[in-house]
């Protein structure tokens, strides 16, 4: 990413910046707009905010619309330009290389961006559903041909559950459920295969990066469901009674552990943070190897909770070629032994400038 322009975005009225390759340190006091700047870059690169599901929230107070424009080179060679406009009424327009696109998925296929914010700790300590969603997003980045599997499976599952409830009400017989049973089984097997493939690609790097960050014997695992037409048919009576499908990948969990103990339950806040950072670094490495393109990393408020050794390990663990935007309240956050920032950007009162 070489150029970013924000127009009526959050705290920024007009802002234009040239971004350096490598490590970019964004410095400023709390509330100055550092996270807003990262959010603007993410919106421009991925088509949506990492902070809110309601895009209208990015529109600056009193403005009618917000606009983000980015320029850069994908895979180090191919120029790209994006323009995202969000209107206060809720309409959003995405333009990639001068042409309107219908979905932000087209941006995600073109540009890889990984994010850490304090809220991301929910992936480690939150519900299984959060971990499943995170894993399925990794599938979209690492195995693009399988990106829609989770959505397709969810749609088939919803149809089967609706048919189960109609059967419970006596409106249909089991023949109405059968086609959706077959679809859930077929898509479930494909989704489980994709999940296992991604976990196998990420797990070794996760263990290595966690150890470097001071969390030895960390492990990433996934236990597949035994989803099949036969398994679903065996549970049909129970499923009809409950009105929901009782076996499948929608009920599985991603296991993050250290020394055989679940970090969700037994991990300290610091260990959970390290695990999330190790997961991000492992995915960045896997993406670099699988796609020959180093992703962009957006790291918000991560350095303040790490000691110097862990800061050095984190920044040193970023794969070669990654552009990293990291926020901090002080320019002393990067230790002497860590890679040096290629650029320092000072943020104050909704404006940003290169030092």
Each model region followed by its residue ranges:
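Conserved NTPase motor "head" modules and their coupling/switch loops across ABC/AAA+ ATPases, GTPases
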Residues: 1-29, 43, 171-296, 305-309, ...
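Short polybasic amphipathic segments
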Residues: 4, 66-72, 90-97, 254-259, ...
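Conserved lysine of the Walker
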Residues: 34
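Nucleotide-state sensing region of NTPase/ATPase domains
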Residues: 42-130, 134-146, 200-208, 218, ...
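An accessory alpha-helical subdomain
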Residues: 120-213
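Walker B catalytic acidic pair
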Residues: 300-302
